[in-house]
Amino acid sequence: ISNYPNPFTSSTVITFKTAGGHTLIQVLDASGRVVANLTDKDYPAGTYTIVFNSGSLPSGMYYARLQNMTIQQVRPMMKARP
């Protein structure tokens, strides 16, 4: 899982690979609270992109978490002030 740009000000594009099957991507804040569910569905194997619009969330560190079958990956993302 990766994202660009990083740091970002209002939105970032998250790219992820899946081996197929159920895929969950969430964004968590520095306290571990889920602030966004970006996708929660079945995907065929492949590489995908999804946009995270941070809206009114404060600047700071966030984490994109990918769960696919038994795989979990976490990507740190920094929201900067505009």
Task: Please give the residue ranges for each predicted region.
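C-terminal outer-membrane/trafficking sorting elements
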Residues: 1-4, 8-82
